[in-house]
């Protein structure tokens, strides 16, 4: 059974655009701010990262989720094709921004190494994140997070007795709650690491 989770977040940092870009490009430092992340490994030969997350199910049994991602970085302008699409989707007002942006993507890797599953509750999923930094006229930096994950669970007894639609809805709701908590925790860590203004923070979770 495939389940999906989504989260969105926005924060305004007092730090300059260049310094903010360096901070958010530090992949391992940033992802380890996630309270559910137990390990990050860089597979140099493949130029990909392996995430391992661990959460507890309603019965306090550990569930291990493994993701393989590749990081990409690129600069953009709010006047180019990507920038216009981003502004239409995420910005209510373009006035605060000078048009300069940086995009950091964690792209799901489909052709990845085999992962040895040590427990039946270990699942290899797909995750993708887009972090967009926008330079404001006042020198501050707006940061937008968008994260999507997908896990394919094997349903065991007695859960297999439940209608799949109901079970899928319940699982995606729980997954979204976990993603909200993780995003909020990461942003709190960012706030403690670099000087922030009172943040404009929106965190949303939901199924695909």
Q: What are the language-model segments listed below?
A:
Residues 42-43, 81-86, 137, 174-183:
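Short C-terminal domain-edge/linker segments immediately following a structured domain
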């Amino acid at each position: 059974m495939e389940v999906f989770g989504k989260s969105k977040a926005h924060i305004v940092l007092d730090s300059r655009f260049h310094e903010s870009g360096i901070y958010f490009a530090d992949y391992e430092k940033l992802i380890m701010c996630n309270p559910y992340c137990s390990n990050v490994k860089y597979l140099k030969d493949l130029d990909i990262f392996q995430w391992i997350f661990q959460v507890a199910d309603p019965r306090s049994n550990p569930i291990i989720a493994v993701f393989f991602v590749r990081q990409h970085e690129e600069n953009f302008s709010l006047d180019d094709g990507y920038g216009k699409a981003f502004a239409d989707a995420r910005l209510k007002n373009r006035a605060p921004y000078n048009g300069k942006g940086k995009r950091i993507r964690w792209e799901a890797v489909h052709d990845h190494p085999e992962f040895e599953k040590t427990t039946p509750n270990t699942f290899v999923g797909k995750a993708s994140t887009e972090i967009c930094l926008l330079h404001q006229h006042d020198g501050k930096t707006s940061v937008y997070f968008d994260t999507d994950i997908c896990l394919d669970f094997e349903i065991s007894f007695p859960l297999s007795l439940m209608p799949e639609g109901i079970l899928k809805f319940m699982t995606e709701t729980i997954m979204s709650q976990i993603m909200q908590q993780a995003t909020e925790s990461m942003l709190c860590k960012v706030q403690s690491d670099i000087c922030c203004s009172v943040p404009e923070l929106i965190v949303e979770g939901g199924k695909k």
